[in-house]
Amino acid sequence: MVRLTIDKYLDKRGITRYELAKRTEVKFQTIDRYYKNRVVRYDSYILDRICSVLECDLCDIIEYVNDKD
């Protein structure tokens, strides 16, 4: 399963969801879903905006977890 780790990344850098929404120009509700890992289909545009604003790689905010464990 793919899991977003935006929450950990933002908390570590002291950035709020509101600030990220404002800087990415993405609706707060959308950023909140990504933050809470409640996204069914990932939007490459949104992931690109998040990575661009945070100056990070995709692998910094997303991880693969083997759900067979």
Predicted ranges, named:
Residues 1-15:
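A short, Lys/Arg-rich alpha-helix, primarily the initiator
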Residues 10, 35, 42, 46, ...:
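DNA major-groove recognition helix of helix-turn-helix
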Residues 15-33:
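Short alpha-helical DNA-recognition segment
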Residues 10, 21, 51:
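The alpha-helix within a helix-turn-helix
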Residues 27, 38, 65-68:
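The DNA-recognition helices of helix-turn-helix-type DNA-binding domains
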Residues 33, 62-69:
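Short, charged recognition helix plus adjacent turn
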Residues 45-60:
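DNA major-groove recognition helix of helix-turn-helix/homeodomain DNA-binding modules
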